[in-house]
Amino acid sequence: MIVRIFNIVALFLAGAFYALALPHDLKNGDLVFRDGDEVISEIIKQVDKSGFSHVGMLWISDYGVQVIHSTPSEHSNIKDGVTVDSLEFFISRAKPNSVRFYQVKGSEEARNIAVQTALERVGEKFSIYPGQGVYCTELVAAAWLRAGVSISTGSRKLDMPFISDNPLIFPENLINSENIFPYPQ
């Protein structure tokens, strides 16, 4: 019975993934946005008008398309923080029809630096508080900035009780950058 349920769930997830048409020319360092299923996603969407709550950086590796991102724990055996997941797993945590790919205007050298910078942070804690870890948009913005490409239009405070009163980078701060543009759907 458990095997049957697992197979049904696996088929559903595989179907959901392959229903999404992947851009044929994805590159290292490109960004993938989603509206996630985490509690923090709902909080972010209260103030961000992009329709997204989470972002990761693509890494085209020997193992396929991977996503480097910082997130509250999505795996039962891995702590919150910067991790590398398969694109399939990243998409499986998205709400239906909420995944979009964006290309960053950057040279191949800049792309490699951005990816390497993000990879160097794998294992770092997830946090929206300065000096205590890194959150998703901060991770990708800092990696690209180290590569010489600014992809953030700024930051702002969340203005919610019990949440950091420090300015945060939101998904719309990235999407509105002149150095980021969407792949055609």
Locations of regions flagged by a protein language model:
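Loop/turn positions that initiate beta-strands
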Residues: 28-32
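Activation targets extended, charge/polar-rich intrinsically disordered C-terminal tails
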Residues: 127-185
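Stable alpha-helical elements in mature extracytoplasmic
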Residues: 110-118, 136-139, 143
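Hydrophobic h-region of N-terminal signal peptides that target proteins for export
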Residues: 10-21
